[in-house]
Amino acid sequence: DASSANYGEGIGNISQLKKMTRSGGEVYTYISRQAIRYNIVQQMQIDNTPVDNAQKVVQFSPNTTIKDYPEIDLFGYMKTTKGGQSIRSAVVRLSNAISLEPYKSDTDFLNNMGLAKRSGLENALAQSEIHKSLYSYTITIDLDKIGIDDDIEIENSEKSERIIKLLDTIQFLWRDIRGRRENLNPLFAVGGIYERKNPYFEDRLKLTKNGLNAGLIKSVKESCEDTQSNTLIGYVPGIFSNEEEIIKTLSPVSISEMFTKLKEEVRAYYA
């Protein structure tokens, strides 16, 4: 649940939210995957990977390795040198966080009258698009590729700790924007450790009049043995209008219980 969490370039004195239009004509705002990645890396305190612009482009320094810098282990890199380039695809993949409620062209009128009055100056005017909504996004982690890059492989205990630190960050994620701190802690979460590396539940959270489509989630969960056996569902009570249906249909646990179970499974995977 967030409010006006990612702005684009804007036009004149109008700050525009990042948004997209679906075929039905409804407009939805989104938080870009790059913005989410920035917040995750910052809050994990792994935003210390050295960079340079020796090749006329800012990129990670050629001598950085995944052993020393978890950021490029999790989110990949491209290093360009005179002899060619080295690429590591992201092992932790993010989707955009797309609003579940449509944008209705609300705007906020702004001025700097308080400052201008101090020196008898004219105040400047501006407008910002505003939107408060629940957002849905997907994180996919390839556990087999964590901590492995060419001839480098870190200890399994370190692989486990990196993923656990990532899960802790996601559970309590927040975002600073324009003087606000937006709480991005998950209110509903579904996932698990699967045999197939498939984001089964991506784009499967649908909201109607603040009611979550529990039947759709159940149908995905029951679609194959992988999801039937390995799916965990967590939620925060008091958010959705059809809470009784959610409990009856999905049998969720608390968000805290879900993340605790996920971390236990990660430790077991790397044991």
Residue locations for each model-derived region?
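RNA-binding basic/glycine-rich loop and surface signature characteristic of RAMP-family CRISPR effectors
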Residues: 1-271
